[in-house]
Amino acid sequence: MVVVVVSSLIMEPAARAENEADIAEDIRFGDFNILAYRDSNNISPTTWYEPDNRSQAIPRIIKDNDWDVVNLQEVQTAFRRKDGSMTPSQIEDMRASADLSAYDFAATDKEGCNFSTSNPMPKIWMQPILYKSDKFALVTQGCFVMSQTPNDFSETSFGWPRNITSWARLRSKANSGEFYVFNTHIAANYGPIGGGGGGVPRQEWLNHQVDQANVLISQIKVINDENLPMMLSGDFNSTFETTPVSAAGTVLDSGLFIDSYNSAETVLTDGPTWNQLVEHGRFTGKIDHILIGEENSPVVTEYAVVPTMRKDADGTLHFASDHNAVSTHVILHWAPPEA
């Protein structure tokens, strides 16, 4: 497995803060679409167990990169096949992994944040937020649908399969500073429910993505009404350059966030975030993004695209996911408490 580990920078906090009295903390954020289990993709190079062992590779990537907080997309519970047998449970395999023993999980099925893409499909999907339990305490958590009625999980996303955003408010055990983490997944081009899943013309799909992005922006404003530091990441299924409209660009243009890639002082490793399950794909863009709340003068010191492919000596390829992970090292600031 090729793993990129984000290195620490040694620095004086006062050199980074606008005001020497500011409270600051270095945090490593990660984002990873792990590729939902399907029987159709449980073949090489993406088997969940042997021989590709995605169930072990994914936790190892998280541990080796030493993320303090990591957002995951496309995580599933077990579901019943037509023959009555059960599929593996990605979430339970991850909870049981020794490589993830340092993490607590927020916004999962245990908190009612599992969902179905459409009714009456089973509620097997979730977007967990993992955080190091020795560094942070969970204050509150939740999730919403990117739709006209965000708190109604019986509703679709504007007539399309449901897409959600999960979120958590965390408190630093080092300085008691609190911040929000938002974890999103914008629609792929499956088309409206009842359309057979074959997709729609590109413009219609992009417009739907922007509808979801606008809900995302409005809900973030409602939830983080105190303007605390925050991170938003996920699979946006769009680059900032996607034309004629871009969901990722719409969120960035809201003025709430800075992009960690374009703001980073150092880019350790670059490349596409969708690997297409090939060693050298034609797609070179980034559809997975880590955005940092613009308020409170955050500093992005490092950024990296983390490859999720490993190659055996005989040339055999194994993929933990069809996405590469994204990693960033950020210094968050809080205003000092009033005297």
Q: Which residue stretches match the model-derived regions?
A:
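Active-site environment of divalent metal-dependent phosphoester hydrolases
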Residues: 38, 77-80, 114, 189-190, ...
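Active-site beta-strand/loop signature of hydrolases that rely on acidic residues for catalysis
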Residues: 29-34, 58-87, 130, 168, ...
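Structured beta-strand-rich core segments of catalytic domains in phosphoester-bond hydrolases
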Residues: 75-187, 305
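Extracytoplasmic/secreted proteins, especially bacterial periplasmic and envelope-associated proteins
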Residues: 53-61, 86-89, 93, 125, ...
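Acidic/histidine-rich helix-loop elements
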Residues: 31-55, 150-159, 187-208
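Metal-dependent phosphoester-hydrolase catalytic domains
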Residues: 220-231, 238-339
